[in-house]
Each structure stands twice: as structure tokens, then as C-alpha cells.
């Protein structure tokens, strides 16, 4: 028990501030920092943006395979491939085991080399600190940590096994890791404090307990039997109205108690006879992953993981205060129960617990590999919280999800995983005649389009002048108002044939002036009262250095004879449209 000392209550009390919407946090001295060129998060309307050198920055990223960045020689041929994919940012792992191979001896040659090559190739970096946990395990901890389980206690599973997983309840482990992370951040400030090649740092990777719902070690069980810390109870009492519905329901369904042990406040733990399974039969596969199973176990672990991560994060921020985030392996149809995904990680049900326990973390980022992309984005932007997608599939759906995340949910960035995998190149082009009216853009094409429109998009993010969307047969159209103009956006229709899928972003830059980007959709200007609106002019074109360069004037079939503003499914495009009014 001696290794599992309690943390300072003051740290968590400060963390309750993080539950507030970002605008309120800024007013209370929370999230926003002075503008000095250092990367920071800043509010613009309802959006939170990443600001670098005083300007908003949209991360068009790609995450390297886990081991790629461990060798500068291995990376040499990869850099040019990354540039060719129109990335502006690379997410690269930096591991505790290589930074501190011997206790107290730090080696930053690899970090220096990554930053040097990124600058040569005009790329930015987000560094991923693989410390105590990577995918719930502790494989990236130094060997001198692994061989000393007495000093660095491990999680114990319900079967008595103590796998290679450091326990988050150990303050000694947190303090030792925090020392290494602080050394890294101090070094980054020294070599990158002016150039700002490194935009953000991810602290740990997909933390949480696998193969059980919580730590069952004697020390952890002793803490589990004690009262819930007052600072965590304050979260439920003082911020009940803004809690995630799943978290609030878990507390209220157990009587909304104001004190007691973890089980008394949050309900029963995982039953002993329950066997975790990754494969569920239908329809359980579609329903169970949306439920909050054994809330007490996940809340208990979330609190302690968040507190541990905050010790590490705050140590780093004292040296160099740039945005830091924690990512989440999500509950999903293929892993519905805590332990089939890392229990206690920053999944949406316990995100508020993380924000309270880890006030140093600037945002919680979902790793999105599931079809329910928009549904889960919605969970993470609840109450105005910022969104970043650090991992996702590099699949034909990636362009669709990119436009949705950035245009609708104000994401600060998007980053498919395995961007350097030799076999993860763009999917082969499918002839339009074989696609059945479905767009088939590559990620490279989508990033190039997004790069062109980024200045305009970032200018209007957080306002009522922008929308992003995905369309399909189940959701073929919707009506929205942009800058006071009511429009209907639907699947493209031409020659009696409707597109099967569509995606895009539309921005109103004036009362009757619009820009759009995407494929497979059309826009109709709706009448308001006696005022009719119609398509005035449509030009396709490009942005060069932020300036609009028009190309073809589109009319006739390309505008359905003036009835709609069209984006054909045959290819990605940027277009400018003006509308006219008849009173």
C-alpha cells in the first residue's frame, strides 16, 4: 500500500474547472493563454482552434506506424512520401524507453532528428509520448521500470494475473515518468521554442485496463473500499446539469448519493461470473456498445488514470506549455464491455471525470475506427469541447469523415493511422461508370482541397456561416440556414439519376455569396415568405495563396439548368456561387 500514496486534493479540485464549457473556462482563467506565437488553443465563436504563430492552423495529418519514428535511417525515404500525400503534420511516437534508457540519463538525439527532418520537408509534428501506457499495456516503459514491479506496481486482474501494465494508482510511478516527460518538454522548448515545429503532444496512448474492468490488486481494492474523494463528488454536485447524460444517469440511478464508498455511490462492480467477450451476436453487437456497463469500475479507473496523467502533463507544461491531449480507444460494437476496450480511458461516458482529474489536459481525442463516426464526434463536442481525431481509418470513408469533422464539428485536425504503411496507399480509382454515383476521392485529393480552403474555413469556423455534412440514401438531404440564408443540401441529381453518397462543406461569405467544396451534392436556395432566391452564377476554381482563381463558368447541365448549385460525384471540386433574390 505504501507505493499507492494519495494525490493532492488541490490538484483535483482545480480540475473541476475543466468541466465548464471552454468559453466559461477562459473567463475563469482556464484554457486560453497569451498570444506569443507558441501553439495554443483559442476560442472563436463556438469553435476551438489551434493557433500557431498567431494564426489558426488546421492539422491535415497522418500518424506513423508505432515503430517507424524510432529510427531516423528508417524514416529517410518516408518523408518524401508524406509530403506527396499533402500532409502538413506528422504524428510520431517518442517513447519513454528511448528517451530514458537508463534512469536519470536522457537521450534526445532521435527527437532532434525528427524535428530537423520535419523542418527540411516543411512539415509540422505532433509528438506521441508513449510512456506508461500504449494501448493499455506498458510495453514502452523502460526495461529498468519493467524489472522492478515492487517500485512500479502493476495492475492485477480478477484471475490474479499481473500483466505488463503499470497501475495508475502509484504516485511513485507517476513522479518518475513525470521527470522524464518534463525533461523532454524542456528540451523541446530549447530547440523548438521559436520555430514551433511541434504543435502538440499526446500524453500516453489509449490508457486503460484491458482484460478486466478495473485494477484488483490489494492496494487498489483498499482504495476502492474507501470513500469517493470529495473533489470528485464536487464534480457531480456542482456540475450536475452539464454532466454527460450517461454519467449523470449512472450516479442518479444509484440514488445520487453525496458520499460513500465507490460501490455505494456508483453501484455494483462487474459480476464475478461475467466473461468478457469481443464477439457479440446480433442484435447485442449494435446495442451493448452504447450502454454504460458497470459504471463504478470505469469511473474508478478513469479518475485514477486521469490523476496519474495529470501529474505527468503538469510536469511537462511547467517546462513548455503547448497543447496536450489524451486519446481514447473507444467502446464499439467489437468491444462493448470495459476490458474489451481499455477501461478507465477517456471514453465519452467518463470524459467529464477525466476533465476534472486532469486539468492539464487541453482536450480528449477519440480514435475513430467505427462507422458511427458522426455519432461519436457529437459525444466529444458536447458542451462546446474541442475535437481532434488523432487516429482513424485510412479508407474510402476517410475523405467523407474529414469534411464532416472539420466542417460540422470544428475539429482542429484529422489524422489517419499508418500513413507510412507500405500497403496503405490510396485505394485504386474506380471508374465513374462503375461507382453507381458514389464519390471516390483519395485522401491526398481531399487534403489538397482542404489545404486550399483552410484559410476561408478557419475564418468562419465557430459561426453560423459554415456547415459540413455526409449524405447517403438514409440521410439524403437536410435544410439549414447559413448567414441568414435558408438552403437545402441534398444528394446530387442529374439526368434523373441521384448520387448514392455525397459530402462537403459550404460557407456563406456574404448575404448572397457562397463557397463550397466536396462531391456528390447539390444546393437549392429556398424561398422565405414572398422572397424567392435562385442560382446566379457558379464558377469552379482553386485557391492559390488564399486568393480565389476562377476557372470554368458552370451553367446548363452543370447547374441543372440553373435550378441548383451542383457538385458532381465524379470528382472533388471547389466552387463559388452567387445567389439572386426576387421580392
Residue ranges of each PLM-predicted region?
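Bacterial N-terminal signal peptides that target proteins for export
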Residues: 1-12
